[in-house]
Each structure stands twice: as C-alpha cells, then as structure tokens.
C-alpha cells in the first residue's frame, strides 16, 4: 500500500523516501533537500508511555491492593519508523492534520491539535476527559454513566459500542474512522489493551488517574497540556460554585459527625480513606473517617469495629454471592443500627469535575435522609 503525499512535487521528505522502492539508493541524498520541507506525520508511529497507578475496575478496587502498570517503549530504529509509515494498516489521521506534542510525565505524544472524530475507549477517564476537553466524541462504551452520557454533544448521532477494555474488538474500532482514541492511562500503562494494535488505527491519548483524590490537578494538568487551561478554570469554577451552594445545607447536619466510604467484596470490606469520594466529601465540609494516607484498607468481618466512629457510611455492593452488609458484625455498627448506611453509585466512585458535581448532590441527599 502506498503513501498519500500532500507535499508539492518540488518538495521531498523522508516519508517520500520511505515509500519509494529506491529508498536505499536515495538515502544518501536526504541531506541535500531543503531543510524547510514539511515534516512527515509520524503520529501513527508514536509509542510513548509513562507509569501510572490505577484501578482497572471494581474488582481491582477490592481484590488488588497495589495494581500498578509500567510499560515503557523506547524509540525504534529508523528503518522501523520508515516501514511503519507505509504499513498495511493506515492511521485514519489525515496526513495534513495539524499535530502537537503532548507531555505526559517524561514522555511525549504526538496528537492532533483539533481532532474531529474522537472515540473514547473507556467509559470513565477516557469519556469524561474527552468531554471536558471539548472533543467531538463520536463513540463510547455502553458502560458510561448516565450523567456523562447527557454531556455528550449531539448524542443522538453517537455510536455506543459494547464495552470490552480487556479484549477490545480492533476490527470494529477500526471502522469508526477515529482520528484520536482516548482511554484510561491505567489500561494503557499495563499494556493490556493492545497498545501496538491501537496505534495502527489512530493516535492514542492515555488520560487520567482513576480514583485519585487529586482529581483537580490531574484534570487541570491534562486540559492545560492540550492548550485548554481556560476550560479547566471554567469547570472548576462551576464545581466550586455548586459546592458553595450546597455546603450550607449539609454542614449543620454533619457538625461533629464522621462519614466513611466502603465497598463489599464477598466476606471483606474495602474501606476507602483517600480517594475521589473522600476529596469531594471534604469539599462539602464532611469529616472523613480514616486511619492513614492509604487509598484503602481491607477489613475482614472481625475488623468491622474499626468503622464504629462513622456516623454515616456510604456503601457500595457489587459482590457476587451475598453481602457482608447482612453479617452480624456489620449490623452491630452504630451507623447500621441507626439506618445510616447509604447505598453508593459505582459510576460516581471516580471522575473529574462533571462527576464531582453530581456526587455533591448524591452526598448531600444521603446525609439528609
């Protein structure tokens, strides 16, 4: 398959040479060509990653205390780069698309400046940060939360596909015509998504840090990195204004009281002490029950008494075979006896400004019950 060239015939670039059967013969002449010649678009060859810590899904939350993924890929040799430019799978990014360098940790990624067909490959980080960036989202997974679905512009024309982050359907994704694929950095950094194959379809932008209490910074850094710092300021101002409106209605109810956030996992409880939820709760003036700086700790039924100081417990239950919330040790907790165990929505357990805003309402409604 040949390369499509968008350069004047009087200009020659490395991409021309890469597509020519006479590449070796002409290689020595490269330095003679004008230095002002347009650069070849190497977006589809970008393979840049950086480490991050994330929780991939609910069971990673409750069953895996330290799931970390580090997948580093160095730059390939020049010959491999030239072959990639004319490979059998073309990137759907137009070769004349304007791109820029996005810094992620110590790595650099080349992405379109103004993508027109963005596919969010995961329903949390990828979708929410794409929406916040103002990207035209044209497809996203079925697992997306309702509050995010409502935010997708022109939602009636958007493709919704079956979620399968651990086993993506590359053939289907390649039919979506994406010029940018956005997904959770956690999936990307573990390499479990099929990174090489993804990059043959379109440039990939790994984003976010799932469940982080520092969601403001993560979101702001991302939006600033793509040149949309004004958007970060805008959505944070909207969130802070909403908190300022709701906080006076709940502070009197929660004065001198503590809240805890937990999730059931068969015969254990994951007690979340420093995450997205606790950060939003503290914005509302709630005192969060915690024992240390860890994201979470696991409690067996004999340790449930460590939650006795919680006046209100927000509890998530996605266990497969019965709930520990019916156990005698759980039922003896003061919050359980007082009917102050509030069901929690899984889809609001992590996120950024959009999710934080609706979480404020959920937390307020919970303590007003």
Question: For the regions a protein language model found, what residue spans apply to each?
Answer:
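N-terminal secretory signal peptides
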Residues: 3-7, 19-65, 76-84
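A short, structured surface patch at a secondary-structure boundary
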Residues: 117-119, 124-176, 180
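Extracytoplasmic ligand-binding site segments that recognize negatively charged/polar headgroups
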Residues: 148, 187-193, 208-222, 256-278, ...
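Proline-aspartate-enriched helix->loop->beta-strand connector
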Residues: 177-183, 309-310
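Extracytoplasmic substrate-binding proteins
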Residues: 195-263, 356-369
